[in-house]
Amino acid sequence: LLPNGESRTTSRDFADMVQSQIVGDLQMQFDSLWSRRSTWDRSYRESRTPSSPSMLLELLSHQNFADMKYGLDPSFRFAVSRAVYKGMLKYLSSRYGTAYVVQPLPVGSMGVSFSKDGNKAIISWKPACDPLEPTADPSGYILHTRVDDGAFDRGVKIKDIKRGNDRLYTEIDITPGHIYSFRVTAYNDGGRSFPSETISIGLPVTADLSEKILIVNNFDRVSAPAFVDTPIYAGFDNRIDSG
């Protein structure tokens, strides 16, 4: 029994809910044939002696090439980590009989530009919806600001949000002669998302607003290293793409 008198078989429910969440999410996002592997009931000290429900998770084998084609992909790792979090959350919801809300996904496609008079920065982003989890919709956004080499502030809830072209916008006053950096996080009753990428903007004291420069972040895609998979040999080739 657990210290509170509850049966340790609740750990079986815990493991089942986390595994079900992982398998379901991976089948939806990466491989519809992703198999559900065995759940063991073994006397491992790490999961047998804790004073709270516990489980051990072994998802991939570093000696399995098919596994590592996924395991080295950052987007796959994020999906698995989020699935573990959602499985834990749903277990706690079931155990205590309370509703749950999943934290939002990070916003994407961040952008910033000057207003026509140059006195404001126009910050824009695309909201991220989680098709696997309807409770993860954001209820609002928080703007974090840094001036020059200072630290980011603790964030301010954005009250004035405009919409257009599938994007959300807000404006903030800026002073020439300083560099402003911004991050946006989404929030709901389940918590805050991870922060967006950092975007920066600045206007010299003497500036010509008639000239414009467009800077595009073209490095927002992630992947595993390039691989070769033939009947003769298989493996990763970092010479082509290290991921």
Residues of each region from the PLM?
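A short, glycine/acidic-enriched catalytic loop
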Residues: 1-6
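Active-site-adjacent substrate-binding region
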Residues: 7-40
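Active-site-adjacent mobile loop/cap segments within catalytic or ligand-binding domains
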Residues: 30-96
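Pro/Thr/Ser/Gly-rich low-complexity, intrinsically disordered linker/stalk tracts
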Residues: 90-137, 176, 190-211
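Extracellular low-complexity, O-glycosylation-prone stalks/linkers
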Residues: 130-159
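Short S/T/G- and acidic-enriched coil/turn segments that sit immediately N-terminal to beta-strands
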Residues: 164-170
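Beta-strand-rich modules
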Residues: 170-192
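Aromatic-Pro/Gly-enriched surface loop or interdomain linker
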Residues: 198-243
